[in-house]
Design a protein with these regions (language model features):
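C-terminal helical cap/extension that packs against the catalytic core
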Residues: 6, 17, 51-53, 95-157
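Nuclease catalytic cores that cleave nucleic-acid phosphodiester bonds
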Residues: 176
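Active-site-proximal loop/hinge segments that shape catalytic or ion-binding/gating pockets
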Residues: 164
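Short, active-site-adjacent cap segments at secondary-structure transitions
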Residues: 167-169
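Short helix-capping segments at alpha-helix termini
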Residues: 23, 74-75, 128-132, 179
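Nucleotide phosphate-binding/pyrophosphate-handling subdomain across enzymes
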Residues: 1-104
């Protein structure tokens, strides 16, 4: 789990402890809850010959946390990123935070989400200069980008899907039989 998740769990435990006079919660129940807590798309790891990591990471701070985790958990092979983000996000700094950890980029567009979606060409205009030395491909949708990444991945590689709840949601839907 990422450091931010541990900090969040610590804050939740502190809040529970403050409520102990009102709520009868045992230490064992708290520990059980922390061990079993899961949120789809937040540092979600799907093991396999090609591991898939799904993390919303929709701002530079979250991308930095993902970078820390990737740095501490290197795959045997390459890290392939599937990235799509909403138009109003700081995508340049999200990409910059992860550049040292990603070997191949699969950029994708997002359907219009309340006026905030963006086509892949708009995303490319914002991050293309950062990726000029990296191998980056552009795809109309997250599903297409994920399919391309899965097709090129080899055993020992990892696919990292990030950028928004919409990005991860589309990927999870495409992976439904595997997830």
């Amino acid at each position: 789990r990422a450091p931010a998740q541990l900090a969040n769990a610590s804050a939740a435990i502190a809040a529970l402890r403050a409520l102990l006079p009102v709520l009868a919660i045992s230490d064992a129940a708290i520990a059980d809850g922390v061990r079993s807590a899961r949120l789809a798309g937040r540092m979600q790891v799907l093991p396999g010959p090609v591991e898939i990591v799904l993390d919303v990471a929709h701002n530079p701070q979250a991308a930095q946390q993902l970078a820390v985790w990737l740095g501490a958990n290197r795959p045997r092979g390459a890290n392939l990123a599937v990235f799509a983000a909403l138009a109003d996000k700081d995508v340049a700094n999200e990409v910059a935070a992860l550049m040292a950890h990603i070997d191949l980029w699969y950029l994708a567009g997002l359907a219009d989400v309340g006026g905030r979606g963006q086509p892949v060409e708009q995303l490319w205009q914002k991050v293309g200069s950062l990726l000029s030395r990296s191998l980056a491909t552009r795809h109309a949708t997250v599903v297409q980008a994920l399919a391309a990444a899965r097709k090129s991945a080899r055993a020992g590689d990892r696919i990292v899907v990030f950028g928004s709840f919409h990005t991860v949601g589309e990927a999870l839907a495409a992976l439904a039989p595997a997830a």
